[in-house]
Regions:
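Radical SAM/AdoMet-radical enzyme domain recognition
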Residues: 1-85
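Short clusters of hydrophobic/aromatic residues that line enzyme substrate/ligand-binding pockets
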Residues: 24-28, 100-102, 190, 206
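Flexible, glycine- and charge-enriched loops at secondary-structure boundaries
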Residues: 30-34, 100-107
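Flexible glycine/acidic-rich beta-alpha junction loops that bind and position SAM and/or redox cofactors
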Residues: 60, 80-105, 128-150
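A broadly conserved sequence feature marking short terminus-proximal activation segments
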Residues: 108-168
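Flexible mid-to-C-terminal extensions adjoining Fe-S/redox cofactors in radical SAM and related proteins
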Residues: 143-210
């Protein structure tokens, strides 16, 4: 790979569904993939690539959010970022939607507790960057908004075709809801979450700041 590209310009974002190998592999249906993924990320880091660990918060893993953060913090060098992300409900069978549903209130306690752990480590010298995307601001207290992506932030601009000079614009599938969020005091700065979440769960999804 090093002969073909400048690895230092690579930014690799890989999803780990859990810090528990069996739970990660239950999601991606690939036995042994957890340790292979971790080893692969470490190898790419040693080669000079920028590494980021993505963790989609689900009903299955929300209770282990602090554990996941601590695992990554102990396992990877400090300049490996950690990204928490809401989930897109597209592709989930309708009969399974209710089982998968998480409101902003459902994740608030665990998210804030994990942020507290992170901020305490920062206070004691840690250089790691942890942040959250595609999660409404009502999922945490205002104090933690510095760790949340805001409307002014551009997370993904589009897709660059490696075989041409074309840049394909990415369809914006994350937003706040005009119907359910308009009265919220954070409406103008909140990035919101996946539109599918609002489509399926409506006002149950959020708790606006009024």
């Amino acid at each position: 790979i090093k002969k073909c590209i400048d690895i230092t310009k690579l930014r690799i974002i890989t999803t780990l569904h859990s810090s528990i190998p069996e739970k990660h592999e239950l999601v991606n249906k690939s036995k042994g993939s957890f340790h292979k993924s971790v080893a692969g990320l470490k190898n790419m880091y040693e080669l000079g690539a920028k590494i980021e660990i993505k963790h989609c918060i689900t009903k299955e893993n929300i209770r282990q959010l602090e554990q996941f953060y601590l695992y990554c913090d102990n396992e990877f060098p400090e300049n490996v970022n950690i990204q928490f992300c809401g989930i897109d409900y597209v592709g989930i069978e309708k009969k399974q939607l209710e089982k998968a549903f998480l409101s902003s209130e459902d994740i608030k306690e665990q998210l804030e507790n994990t942020f507290d752990l992170y901020l305490n480590k920062r206070k004691h010298g840690s250089k790691r960057h942890l942040y959250a995307i595609n999660i409404p601001l009502c999922a945490c207290d205002v104090y933690y908004w510095k760790l949340m992506s805001l409307k002014k932030d551009i997370v993904y601009e589009g897709y660059a075709d490696p075989y041409s000079n074309n840049l394909m614009e990415a369809e914006r599938n994350v937003a706040v809801s005009e119907k359910y969020c308009r009265e919220c005091k954070a409406y103008e700065i909140c990035n919101g979450t996946y539109k599918t979440a609002f489509d399926y769960f409506g006002e149950r999804l959020v708790k606006p700041y009024l």
